[in-house]
């Protein structure tokens, strides 16, 4: 009889333990306001929150990561056709939905590749889990994410400028090939891949990058504004740009990056109302000094750049991760924080433009 009681108690204990573990992820409270609650007069707070441990575990509603192949060109002296590929995050429910999806074009840093954010197809990172949870909890809009590479043939290249020239040149590949081919294959806000429709859907497109991917992001602000409203550079500045440009203006001269951006925005036919820059870096990141220099320079050009501190009112801000360095941990933190904020901005703008929510 005693043995039966002991066995019963052990089984009961195991069942209780399993139930507690199963519910642990469900009990994680939301960190951000659900995007569906955003109204035309909602304030959008700016700040960095820590990633709850539960968000790093697999979500119930899991998106997937697949490979997307496309044809492009070197767009240099070689003038060579290339077959390249990107990894694509497809949110849970995409296949059964008829909705259109925002797109985040995402770029790795120096020596990185398309796996730098999501991982390998058979060994995905917990960044993917974080995105799944944010979408499941309605803290960010379901978005397609395109993890691309600026390297020719998707192969790391030896360069004498830490890839700066490649980050600048990627604009032609993006505009002419990757963007139209991807948005032809997937259901985005572009009604077609005509130039007119791609431009008309710019409010639902984001460019995001880490390190030299952040440099890529700043360059896209200078040449691709017709396709993108939102720019999210993680830990990188134009002071890391191509060597000829930096030599011309000076690596430690803080007074040229904002004017360069200002001139490029105007040359593309846009104004201060046409974009938002959500920059993030860490206080212990080696990129911090030059990122902060660029942000300070932009603050001096208030006709074009209107700085936000606590909430979204202007068109750019810098959020700092306390003690964050230049690493994967910081990347995950910035993904976790930036995508909900951008989602809220997109929803609020859609409401204001539609005239709904009166």
Predicted segments with their positions:
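Positively charged n-region of N-terminal signal peptides that target proteins for export
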Residues: 1-4
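Short, linear, compositionally biased motifs with a strong N-terminal bias
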Residues: 10-11
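C-terminal motif of bacterial Sec signal peptides marking the signal peptidase cleavage site
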Residues: 14-17
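Short, conserved catalytic or interaction motifs in soluble domains
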Residues: 20
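Non-catalytic cap/lid and distal C-terminal segments of serine-dependent acyl enzymes
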Residues: 23-358
